């Protein structure tokens, strides 16, 4: 069995030179021994641009019966750029159905995932992010009888438990001079470094086991 990942920069794989940024999809195989993971997530992609660039079509030439297709977007679907933007209740949902139908056409099993949360603390409170998109994923999963990994809710709870300062270690907060890729430091509350990627990869693997999709 092979697990294919369709997604954006939060799931994507990175080179050592780009450290410490790390996507959860990059580490998923560490929590699923013996399972082949093909991480096709790519930074800057939405449900729309991933399709228009032929990335799902490429997966179609490889995916086989019994494989899994993990589908996680949103961060770039919210963009104002016309080539990326989708509406949560119309074009976003329709696009997700294309991924679901493609997997099923080849006998593979689709798995829908809500996005990981943004680390948005204000006055001691963790703010909601992503608008209606997580709900749109949940509704479609129920309508189409697709397993749902609610990473948005899982990550919100995890970040909230760690608190404002404690959750910085999950995301791309680095000191000046600590990494060549970030000579001036960084404070990014969307992308993860290894600690965050490990946590979210572990949650994903655990959910797949709970669904009985992997052993």
What would you call each of these model-derived segments?
Residues 1-42, 57-65, 69:
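Serine-esterase "nucleophile elbow" of acetyl-processing enzymes
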Residues 13, 47-48, 79, 121:
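Glycine/Thr-rich phosphate-binding loops of Rossmann-like dinucleotide-binding domains
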Residues 54-198, 202-215:
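Alpha-helical cap/lid subdomain in secreted, periplasmic
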């Amino acid at each position: 069995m092979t697990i294919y990942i369709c997604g954006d920069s939060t799931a994507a794989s990175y080179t050592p030179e780009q450290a410490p940024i790390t996507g959860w999809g990059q580490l998923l195989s560490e929590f699923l021994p013996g399972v082949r993971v093909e991480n096709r997530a790519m930074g800057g992609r939405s449900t729309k641009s991933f399709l228009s660039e032929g990335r799902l079509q490429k997966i179609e030439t490889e995916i086989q019966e019994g494989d899994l297709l993990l589908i996680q977007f949103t961060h770039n679907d919210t963009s104002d750029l016309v080539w990326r933007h989708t509406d949560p209740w119309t074009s976003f949902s329709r696009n997700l159905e294309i991924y679901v139908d493609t997997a099923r056409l080849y006998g593979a099993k689709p798995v829908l995932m809500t996005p990981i949360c943004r680390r948005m603390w204000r006055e001691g409170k963790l703010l909601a992010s992503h608008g209606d998109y997580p709900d749109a994923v949940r509704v479609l999963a129920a309508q189409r009888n697709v397993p749902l990994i609610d990473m948005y809710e899982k990550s919100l709870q995890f970040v909230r438990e760690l608190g404002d300062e404690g959750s910085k270690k999950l995301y791309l907060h680095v000191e000046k001079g600590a990494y060549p890729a970030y000579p001036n430091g960084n404070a990014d509350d969307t992308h993860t470094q290894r600690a965050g990627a490990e946590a979210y990869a572990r949650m994903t693997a655990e959910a797949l086991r709970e669904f009985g999709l992997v052993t």
